[in-house]
Amino acid sequence: MKYELIKKQGRARRGQLQFDRGTVETPAFMPVGTYGTVKGMTPEEVKGTGAEILLGNTFHLWLRPGQEIMKLHGDLHDFMNWKGPILTDSGGFQVFSLGKTRKITEEGVHFRSPVNGDKIFMDAEKSMQIQYDLGSDVVMIFDECTPYPATHDEARISMERSIRWAERSRNEFDRQENPNALFGIVQGGVYEDLRDVSVEALTKIGFDGYAVGGLAVGEPKEDMHRILEHTCPQLPEDKPRYLMGVGKPEDLVEGVRRGIDMFDCVMPTRNARNGHLFVTGGVIKIRNAKHKTDTTPLDPECDCYTCQNYSKSYLHHLDRCNEILGARLNTIHNLRYYQRIMASIRKALEEDRFEQFVEEFYARRDREVPPLKDL
């Protein structure tokens, strides 16, 4: 993987990630394909929304179908028939979200399989091995996602363990002679001094890119913005920056304003299945009775298959009848909406009018532009 920083405006960055499997224009949003599928979509449909890179889930694909089935096909690209690059998370967050059914030790994490209750152990080395078998173009280190809230001491202990696991991940990745990219993950909760320690340790180990982890786990938005403003300027300028598990459309804009290049989130797909659809002016809840007789498209500005062919009335009808097509059409629209936002951000950066884009983005939602700490 090669990263090229093409242009900057303030902290916002316009760049390119070059992989053997294709080029990804940044800032980029990655749809989430947890089990080797973006729910309800064929790979061609996902590509049709403008997505150039997908996220796969190491933890879930390890439990089902498992490494052996993956190797029978070649790798995850062959298994799911996605021709572009794939980033896989390390499984750290999924293990973290198992709650009381897991036990974290210095070696790794002991837990019971959510599939069949079997006792399972995962560590940095195992995560690297699974991601190697998946053929991931971007491999994430195995880390511990610091919960929120956490005391300074709890966040410190968690962050220090993540650093040791990062080193083990790096060593195993190098031992495999894996030709792909390995990203480090900055932890430290909402504490700036801990983020400093994490950044320093990770940059010393050396990675192909750096993720900011442990955000969007329940902390106030102001804390997320503060940590990004503090952390991003310390990360190497010539490496991509990835904000994990984020987020709402405004979170993408705010992340880019603070120097982030890559995002992923289940929100566009999950919300689509629940009938919450993103449009230029905000959100439409297609379930609401007022859409029953509305023959207009979801968003007159949207060029997606759904908006070009169907009315709100039809989508309301499909939702009320729990038709699979409704979830599919909604997902196509939401994924395209997210890709349109990213394309608009990239164009605005190319044309040196990103600040104007931000003002217009919030004006259409009748909201104030959130404050940004001076450079």
From Swiss-Prot:
<feature type="binding site">
    <location>
        <position position="302"/>
    </location>
    <ligand>
        <name>Zn(2+)</name>
    </ligand>
</feature>
<feature type="binding site">
    <location>
        <position position="143"/>
    </location>
    <ligand>
        <name>substrate</name>
    </ligand>
</feature>
<dbReference type="GO" id="GO:0008479">
    <property type="term" value="F:tRNA-guanosine(34) queuine transglycosylase activity"/>
</dbReference>
<dbReference type="InterPro" id="IPR004803">
    <property type="entry name" value="TGT"/>
</dbReference>
<feature type="binding site">
    <location>
        <position position="304"/>
    </location>
    <ligand>
        <name>Zn(2+)</name>
    </ligand>
</feature>
<keyword id="KW-0479">Metal-binding</keyword>
<feature type="binding site">
    <location>
        <position position="333"/>
    </location>
    <ligand>
        <name>Zn(2+)</name>
    </ligand>
</feature>
<keyword id="KW-0328">Glycosyltransferase</keyword>
<dbReference type="Pfam" id="PF01702">
    <property type="entry name" value="TGT"/>
</dbReference>
<dbReference type="GO" id="GO:0002099">
    <property type="term" value="P:tRNA wobble guanine modification"/>
</dbReference>
<feature type="binding site">
    <location>
        <position position="307"/>
    </location>
    <ligand>
        <name>Zn(2+)</name>
    </ligand>
</feature>
<comment type="function">
    <text>Catalyzes the base-exchange of a guanine (G) residue with the queuine precursor 7-aminomethyl-7-deazaguanine (PreQ1) at position 34 (anticodon wobble position) in tRNAs with GU(N) anticodons (tRNA-Asp, -Asn, -His and -Tyr). Catalysis occurs through a double-displacement mechanism. The nucleophile active site attacks the C1' of nucleotide 34 to detach the guanine base from the RNA, forming a covalent enzyme-RNA intermediate. The proton acceptor active site deprotonates the incoming PreQ1, allowing a nucleophilic attack on the C1' of the ribose to form the product.</text>
</comment>
<feature type="binding site">
    <location>
        <position position="187"/>
    </location>
    <ligand>
        <name>substrate</name>
    </ligand>
</feature>
<comment type="subunit">
    <text>Homodimer. Within each dimer, one monomer is responsible for RNA recognition and catalysis, while the other monomer binds to the replacement base PreQ1.</text>
</comment>
<feature type="active site" description="Proton acceptor">
    <location>
        <position position="89"/>
    </location>
</feature>
<keyword id="KW-0819">tRNA processing</keyword>
<keyword id="KW-0862">Zinc</keyword>
<feature type="binding site">
    <location>
        <position position="214"/>
    </location>
    <ligand>
        <name>substrate</name>
    </ligand>
</feature>
<keyword id="KW-0808">Transferase</keyword>
<comment type="similarity">
    <text>Belongs to the queuine tRNA-ribosyltransferase family.</text>
</comment>
<keyword id="KW-0671">Queuosine biosynthesis</keyword>
<dbReference type="GO" id="GO:0005829">
    <property type="term" value="C:cytosol"/>
</dbReference>
<feature type="active site" description="Nucleophile">
    <location>
        <position position="264"/>
    </location>
</feature>
<dbReference type="GO" id="GO:0101030">
    <property type="term" value="P:tRNA-guanine transglycosylation"/>
</dbReference>
<comment type="pathway">
    <text>tRNA modification; tRNA-queuosine biosynthesis.</text>
</comment>
<dbReference type="InterPro" id="IPR050076">
    <property type="entry name" value="ArchSynthase1/Queuine_TRR"/>
</dbReference>
<feature type="region of interest" description="RNA binding">
    <location>
        <begin position="245"/>
        <end position="251"/>
    </location>
</feature>
<feature type="region of interest" description="RNA binding; important for wobble base 34 recognition">
    <location>
        <begin position="269"/>
        <end position="273"/>
    </location>
</feature>
<dbReference type="InterPro" id="IPR036511">
    <property type="entry name" value="TGT-like_sf"/>
</dbReference>
<dbReference type="GO" id="GO:0008616">
    <property type="term" value="P:queuosine biosynthetic process"/>
</dbReference>
<dbReference type="InterPro" id="IPR002616">
    <property type="entry name" value="tRNA_ribo_trans-like"/>
</dbReference>
<protein>
    <recommendedName>
        <fullName>Queuine tRNA-ribosyltransferase</fullName>
        <ecNumber>2.4.2.29</ecNumber>
    </recommendedName>
</protein>
<dbReference type="GO" id="GO:0046872">
    <property type="term" value="F:metal ion binding"/>
</dbReference>
<feature type="binding site">
    <location>
        <begin position="89"/>
        <end position="93"/>
    </location>
    <ligand>
        <name>substrate</name>
    </ligand>
</feature>
